[in-house]
Amino acid sequence: MSVKVSGGGVLAQVLRDGVHSDTTSAVIVVDVDGEHSIPSIAQLTDNQIDEIFEQPMQRVIAALQEAHEANCRRIVVVVPTTGMSGGACYAPQAALAESARILVKSAARQWGSTGITVNAVAVEPHWFAIDPSISGPVAIAPRSLSNEVSPVGVITWLCSEASQDVTGQTIVCDGGLWM
């Protein structure tokens, strides 16, 4: 069964190519803009807040609504771990990622009684072009896994019937970078 993947960038394409499901599913890659860092929260403008936070958050809400209207049984929202740890010069991006994770929990509570699961997957910041030399590390230790980490397997499982008992959760899939 096909999985509808919304969002742009390399990660969304990797997920379109690799994620499959045995039930109607949607994957929402949050449009976190890691290309534009903000030197200081004090310098953040209304236009930047609108472009980096508000518009992408509206797209997450719309994608969740579309998935619900399409009777998706599994919904997965993908964010960077930067939201969980914060990131110097990436405050609006971190706020967007955390807002999306809170929305996941709320949707899971609302829709769970109808058999819909809603979860988040937090991946390495590089998938969103977030520069760790600017944001600072998300951990005080190096990653525990040395291979390149793909979230395809975790997201495929969350889109399956086998994951029916997991909802409202964030699964970290970053090779042990954020613990």
List the predicted regions and their residue ranges.
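Canonical Rossmann dinucleotide-binding motif of NAD(H)/NADP(H)-dependent dehydrogenases/reductases
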Residues: 1-23
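C-terminal helical subdomain
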Residues: 55-62, 113, 120-123, 135-175
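Structural motif
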Residues: 25-27, 74
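Short, aromatic/basic amphipathic alpha-helical patches
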Residues: 11-18, 92-104, 133-138
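Residues immediately C-terminal
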Residues: 178
